[in-house]
């Protein structure tokens, strides 16, 4: 029988589901992790937490279901919105990730908006305003 793995790497934890082709849930597992707030309005996480939680929940789901890995026909993955993971030339993470809800880039948003000729001009150019949660200001 075909099975499908769904992995949601969220802000507070990772949830993994194993389902059958008809949508019936066969197994599920969740692993939570902390959110660092080093200053008011700042939110960060170590991306290693996401990886460890993903490995843990996939292993738990596969072990509890006794489904063979070869029977998993596809993997669906969703992750946090607009987080920035900064890496060096070798691909190593160099600092905690700035999350989608991090608000430290208000000054950068103002600078981008001004450089574009104002809010309306920026929206006309890229179809969005500069917001603290988006990638460009980070």
Stretches with model-predicted labels:
Residues 56-138:
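Glycine-rich phosphate-binding/catalytic subdomain of phosphoryl-transfer
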Residues 2-8, 71-76:
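Short glycine-aspartate micro-motif
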Residues 5, 27, 68:
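Conserved Rossmann-like nucleotide-binding pocket used by diverse enzymes
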Residues 4, 16-17, 84:
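Generic short beta-strand
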Residues 9-50, 92-99:
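Short glycine-rich, Thr/Ser-proximal phosphate-binding strand/loop in the N-terminal lobe
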């Amino acid at each position: 029988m075909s099975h499908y793995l769904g992995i949601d790497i969220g802000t507070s934890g990772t949830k993994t589901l194993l389902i059958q082709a008809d949508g019936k849930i066969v197994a599920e597992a969740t692993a939570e992790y902390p959110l660092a707030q080093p200053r008011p309005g700042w939110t960060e996480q170590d991306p290693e937490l996401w990886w460890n939680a993903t490995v843990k929940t996939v292993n738990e789901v596969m072990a509890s279901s006794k489904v063979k890995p070869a029977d998993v026909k596809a993997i669906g993955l969703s992750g946090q919105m607009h987080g920035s993971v900064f890496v060096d030339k070798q691909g190593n993470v160099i600092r905690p990730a700035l999350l989608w809800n991090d608000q430290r880039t208000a000054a950068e948003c103002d600078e981008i908006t001004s450089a574009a000729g104002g809010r309306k001009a920026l929206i006309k150019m890229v179809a969005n305003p500069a917001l603290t949660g988006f990638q460009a200001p980070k």
